[in-house]
Amino acid sequence: MAVSTNELAILAIVLLVTAVVFYTKGTRRAPLPPGPRGIPFLGNLFQFNVMRPYPQYLKWAQKYGPVFSIKLGSQRIIVLSTSEAADELFVTRSKLYSSHESPHVGFDLVSDQQRMVFMPYSREWKIVRKNVHGILGPGPSKQMRKMQDLECRIMLHDLLCHGDTSIVEDFVEGPHGKVPERHWFSIIRRYTTSLMMTLVYGRRIHRIVDNPELHQVYEMMSNMTHVSQPGRYLVDALPILRWLPDIMAPWRAEGKRMHEWEMGFWGKLFADSRTAFLNGTGLNGFVQSYLSARAEAGLEDLPGKGATEDGAGWMRDKLITYTAVSIIEAGSDTTSTAVFSFVLLMLSNPDALRRAKEEMGAVVGSSRMPDWEDEDRLPWLTACIKETLRCAPPLPLGIPHKADEDDVYNGYLIPKGSTVIGNIWAIHMDPVRYPDPTAFKPERFYNPDGKLNWASGPDTHNRDHYIFGWGRRFCSGKYLAEASMFIVLSRLIWGFDFYAASDPQTGKVKLPDVNDVDTFTDGLVTAPKIYPVGFKPRSEKHAEMIKASYRDVQNDWQSMGLAGDER
């Protein structure tokens, strides 16, 4: 049958229209979550403080709902402000959301793509996670309790000797929030850092004053919380800028310089540890154990970064170095920050503090120090710790996740490549979940008759708080952190009457306002800025026990082959 030219033209038009309709229907996408209107190209970049976004995110959640979206340049950010939304995406749909956002400067440049916390969900991340879980998991972390006990006893002695030094000397923070080495914050930091350094490298932090090693660790951690904050660098919001030449990309030189700074410290620690291992003089720790196992597999020398491609997936030297960093960071910052917030909140709520002391006196008394076996018998103290973590989460927005595929949630599109944030601050300030959310009310978690349930428990929907994240990226150091928080804070309540500074003219107590965001530092991790506190032993008997315990621990260090304390 012959077909005319007109018929061919009509057929072509019909086919074209059909194809267009089919294509349009097949690719019609759900709408994005609502959010504030931005400006062309830059989006919402200049509408809030990118170094302290959580107060504005809470306001936007109240206006636009539990799931809203913003843009920082070309970077789409989806913010989840209810536990239901975060649980659904990060736990139930974890296959799509187990990657973390990898900031260009913080991950690619400063960390040379080796820092676990910012790795995508990949084979390399699984290798690192397996090794980290092997020493920080629920079983292995309990093996650290002796070290936690001993280091905590040193901490108590340091606070006893410190007395009212922080009040009398009225210290001021140094550049970039640097803590003076004689401030009481440094005593707490020594505890957490020494614990983690012993776990990883088999060496203690046995001195506070004139010890640049201790303070550089926290300078580097503080630096990382700033450079990895979404929106901190324009290149993270506009990835096309990565193609600029060096002369037009100052962040590139800055990132490389910071990497050299980190490797000058962490890289030297690893190199010294490896040399000691090769010489047969190595100390017991994660790095030594891993190098030994790797050598037994015939891979004594394995420079470079990443892991081997074989089934064993042995970590190369730089990946071991940054895995050690990840372990130290996981166990140091959260714990010390929680202690600073706990002391501030308890001093701001004297009735809660009085009740904690009364409970401690009734359960433990003055003839011994509290231990982990007392935890279930100290429900008010545990409730105070949980309420501290709710009111002052160390990571108000957690670690940002990334959508590995397009997804639809509650009718809203979450495009592939979007940064997806679990808004811990908004969840913790939800008046439905926590009535009167800005008030410090430990009774929310007070359960004198039941088994205490920490955030590391299996029930993701009824957790007390969300500071350890969600799903497959749940914080590896959670078990060690919870154990440290309990032993440090229980013994602090047991051993001391701690008190704030007073105004010499009015006699009124001077304390930072816990509900003022300016009380806390900026960045991915937020901690109280330094404030003065004095420490007085609750009795002469408590003081003598602390002194005797300090002397006994020096013998323990000697028998364990670890450095004794220098004060």
From Swiss-Prot:
UniProt-listed CDD domains: CYP64-like (cd11065)
GO CC annotation, single: membrane
Gene Ontology MF terms in the entry: heme binding; iron ion binding; monooxygenase activity; oxidoreductase activity, acting on paired donors, with incorporation or reduction of molecular oxygen
Requisite cofactors: heme
Pathway, per record: Secondary metabolite biosynthesis
Pfam families: p450 (PF00067)
Glycosylation positions in this chain: N223, N279
Residues the record lists as binding heme: C475
Superkingdom as given in the UniProt entry: Eukaryota
Bilayer-spanning residue ranges: 7-24
Membrane topology: Single-pass membrane protein
EC id: 1.-.-.-
UniProt keyword terms in alphabetical order: Glycoprotein, Heme, Iron, Membrane, Metal-binding, Monooxygenase, Oxidoreductase, Transmembrane, Transmembrane helix
Protein family per UniProt: Belongs to the cytochrome P450 family.
Chain's role: Cytochrome P450 monooxygenase that is able to use dehydroabietic acid as a substrate for oxidation.
Protein name listed in UniProt: Cytochrome P450 monooxygenase 79
Upper taxonomic lineage: Eukaryota, Fungi, Dikarya, Basidiomycota, Agaricomycotina
Gene: CYP079
